[in-house]
Amino acid sequence: LLCYTYMIIITTVNLKEITMKLSESTVSFLKNYANINQSLEFREGSTLRTVSPLNTILASVEIGEDFPKTFPIYELNRFLGTLSLFKDPELVFSESSVSIKDGSHESTYHYCGSSSMFQTPPEKEIDFPDAEVSFELSEDIFKKTINAANTLGLPEVVVQGDGKEIYILVSDTANVTSDSFSTVVGSTDKTFRMIFKLENLSKIMEGTYDVRLSSK
């Protein structure tokens, strides 16, 4: 009768540290996202996506960096504030935290327990219906429209067409004597009126946009 004794040796392998740096443009996008939702689930890859707590704003952007793993940050502004403590921060990722390093300085920032603690965008891209109205909104007109709404104390941004031209204007549609400020942004053969809350549009990052609108 032969008896064999097996000895199993389990060793821990130290994986190579995964490091990356964030560009100024990516940090700018993250600052804007913090206005939309205080929390963010960073997903593996080069796409940053967020959604407002009430599902009224969905934002998505392709960045130059490629995140090596998915991790949730509950207080995005706090995370960005920690980054700002460093001149040239380098991020080193582990299973439960990210280390932020620059020379002799280092901070360890822990991920939150689960992304189920806050609203996250859907995994799949939204299948946007065919646009009924489209136009280019320049950064200058976008800024002037938001500034006009704030100056006049008006709660809504309206995009409307009169069968000839497309206007973007600020107004209070509940008040028939409301002040207004409008700008022509395109032409159309349709008559329509679409109303948006200023509090939502004011969270959008300044820039020039190709606007596509649908009533569906």
Where are these regions (language model features)?
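DNA polymerase processivity clamps
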Residues: 3-112, 128-216
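Acidic/charged, solvent-exposed loop-and-adjacent secondary-structure segments enriched in E/D, K/R, S/T
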Residues: 121
